[in-house]
Regions:
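Conserved beta-strand termini and adjacent loop/short-helix elements that scaffold enzyme active sites
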Residues: 139, 180-183
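Conserved N-terminal glycine/acidic-rich loop preference
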Residues: 96-99, 105, 147-177
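Radical SAM enzyme core and accessory elements
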Residues: 182-195
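Conserved AdoMet/S-adenosylmethionine-binding subsite of the radical SAM
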Residues: 1-152
């Protein structure tokens, strides 16, 4: 069991207040902060001592891709700083006797079709910077939900060959603390119905 906060930056004061109250009343399970990685370090510093596990994304290591797909030319700089703050707070990943993570940072990276170079750069940066102190989740679940006119390369799923290329690079880098996806994960059945 855990408390999973998803994209909660705009509620940090309320989160802190609620967690203080819950802990006074006996809350004793890990708090997980699930994030795009595009966070201000000032906000994350407020969460020190409140969050046990950070789950940020590192979407891009190429500022041009960050601008092209997310209109965020500062994404790389912001995400690097945010992940650095998260790891500073949590330290090396720790697991309980049950095998579940109790403390640490797991960085997720979603491979985009046609952009394995970005993925390999992202993995290299994470591994060279944090080594085995973090876990890296290498995801192949990109699912196009509509046809893009402006981004034609995003109109398809990641191929098996692309995913294997990134996984092979991770192995060659010596990444040991990681998660991979097997089977068919790029399907609309994995996307919540928001209607």
């Amino acid at each position: 069991a855990n408390i999973n906060l998803v994209t909660g930056a705009h509620y940090v004061p309320q989160i802190i207040e609620a967690l203080d109250m819950a802990r006074r009343n006996g809350l004793d399970i890990p708090v997980v902060y699930n994030s795009s990685g595009y966070e201000k370090t000032e906000t994350l510093k407020l969460l020190e001592g409140y969050v046990d596990i950070y789950l940020p994304d590192l979407k891009y290591l190429d500022p041009e891709l960050a601008q092209k797909f997310s209109y965020a030319p500062d994404y790389v700089q912001a995400a690097k700083a945010a992940i650095g703050e998260m790891v500073r707070q949590t330290g090396k990943c720790e697991f309980g006797e049950d095998g579940y993570i109790r403390k640490g940072t797991i960085v997720r990276h979603l491979i985009l079709p046609g952009h394995t170079g970005n993925s390999i750069k992202a993995l290299r940066y994470l591994h060279e910077t944090y080594g085995e102190d973090i876990y890296i989740s290498i995801m192949n679940q990109y699912t196009p939900v509509r046809k893009f006119v402006e981004f034609k390369e995003l109109n398809r799923k990641v191929t098996k060959r692309e995913y294997e290329k990134v996984l092979d690079a991770a192995v060659d880098m010596g990444i040991q603390n990681g998660f991979i996806q097997e089977g068919e994960t790029a399907s609309e059945s994995f996307i919540p119905d928001f209607d």
